[in-house]
Every structure is written in C-alpha cells, then in structure tokens.
Amino acid sequence: MKATFYLLLTLFAIKLNAQVGINTQTPETTFDVVGKPNDTSHYDGIIPPRITGDQLANKFYTQSKKGAVVFATAPASNLSGQVINISEVGMYYFDGNV
C-alpha cells in the first residue's frame, strides 16, 4: 500500500511540458491547428466561446486573462466597464485595459 502511494505521488509530481497539435503529429508552436484544405467534408477554423455582451459583463477579467478571445453573439445592454466596446456582434479580445 505504501509503495503504491509513493508511486502515485511520484507520477503526479512529475511536471510535463508539451505542445498540443490538432491534425498534426509535429506541432510547431504551443497550440498548432492544421486545417484540411482539400477535404470538403471538414470545415477549417477555430470557433471561440460564443457569449452575449450581458453574459460577458457578469464576468470579471483580470490581467491574467489578457489575450482572451470571445465571440459576442449580442451587444451589451450597458456599455460600461469591460464591455464598453461590445456594441455589436463580433469577435473581441481582452487587451487588459478597461
């Protein structure tokens, strides 16, 4: 029992760094997505989280969320704070400034 515990503790203590690749065995960056341009049955692209401006207003983004990308499906009702610029449907990113 003790040996199993130490084995599991050792396995979970090992820190792994990896690159993630989608449709590739050799990712070139931290997150590498390779499309299938010649396969018409697959749609290429990345879809970010879809959320309304009002739903986004209920969340509090800090500097650690800088660079976050969302697709606003509706503008915010009250254009203030972190949703001051969410005035129409579209892709938005958080640059750390409110």
Name the predicted role of every residue range:
Residues 1-12:
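Hydrophobic, helix-prone linear segments
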Residues 2-4, 19-98:
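C-terminal trimerization/auto-chaperone modules of long, extracellular attachment fibers and adhesins
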Residues 13-17:
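N-terminal signal peptide c-region/cleavage motif recognized by signal peptidases
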